[in-house]
Swiss-Prot record:
InterPro entries in the record: Kunitz_BPTI, Kunitz_BPTI_sf
The organism of origin for this protein: Cyriopagopus hainanus (Chinese bird spider)
Gene3D superfamilies named in the record: Pancreatic trypsin inhibitor Kunitz domain (4.10.410.10)
Domain BPTI/Kunitz inhibitor: 4-33
Superkingdom as given in the UniProt entry: Eukaryota
Annotated protein name in UniProt: Kunitz-type serine protease inhibitor hainantoxin F7-25.66
Classification of source organism: Eukaryota, Metazoa, Ecdysozoa, Arthropoda, Chelicerata
Length: 33
């Protein structure tokens, strides 16, 4: 699985994990949790 191609899903947990998604032009970072 190419993790950079996954959608940006922030989730419902109270943790804070760094994740990546493809924003249409580049692989971008977001915080999950």
């Amino acid at each position: 699985i190419d993790t950079c191609r996954l959608p940006s899903d922030r989730g419902r947990c109270k943790a804070s994990f760094e994740r990546w998604y493809f924003n249409g032009r580049t692989c971008a970072k977001f915080i999950y949790g």
